[in-house]
Each structure stands twice: as C-alpha cells, then as structure tokens.
C-alpha cells in the first residue's frame, strides 16, 4: 500500500490505488464508494471498506485479481515518471508483499523466516514491471475489465488513456534477494 500516486477516473481524483480497488468491491453502493475514495491513505481506505464487506459484489473473490491488475496499471501509467522508476529499482528481484496474516496478497514468514503464500500483489507488481520495460509508446489505453456492473458512483467506468510524459530514468540501487521457499501460482 504505497501512497503518493494519485489516480484519476474521468474528473474524479482518487488518492490511492487501494482506495480505487476497495471502491470497486461495491459498484452497487455509490455512497460507500464515495466514503472510501475520500480517505487520504491506503490503510484508511481499506478500513473504511471493512464494515461493508458482507455487501461486496457477489463475484468479488473471482474478480479481485483482475480488478487489482487494472488498478495497478492505472497507477503505473498515470504516475509513469515516478512509479515506473520505483518498479525498475527492484531490478529483477522478486517483489514480495511480506505480511503477518495475509497469505493471498502477500507471503507470511515462518519460524525460519521462509515466506509462504500466494503473493498475488507481488506477482502483479512483477508483471507490471515487465510491462513497463516494454512500453515505447507515448500513450497507453487502459481498457476496463470485462465485468458486469463495473461502476463508480453509479456510472460505468470508462477506458482510460494515459499520455506518458517521458520514459522514466532509473538510478540503480543495491538490493537483496528475498528468501522465498514456496509460492503458489494463481490464475488471472
């Protein structure tokens, strides 16, 4: 959950990709979406969604990776000169969301400090890093996921065109590899 990379859906400013992701849980509840999107930090956006989780879209578990991928792509391409640099600084090292309780989005260390879990967020970020390396266009069109009821504030979410200002320049930093013992694959 990294703040500092705002997203625009039309003229709606969303401060974090986590807020957009959480809002997408509730396409049928525009007031809940507004409350989530008003939050300034990723964590408070997530916490704002918690009381409403039982009202999540019926297919949430089936579509959450697709929606997170879409949110992260918007985050990257609307913050191209900064977020692409952050991704490139990871070089070719694994990106792991280390967590103490979420083995789906992250990976949990065991008593020997080996990480176990799906690491879905880390995998999506590595996928995005590879995509960013292969972008040579001046603009990118991000289509919405092909989902029923993909709405924000009661309106269909449009595809988004991002104009890339310039290719990011990267200052390489020294990194250490994570000790990943086992990671399970997930499907799109």
Residue ranges and their predicted role:
Residues 1-188:
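Charged, low-complexity intrinsically disordered segments
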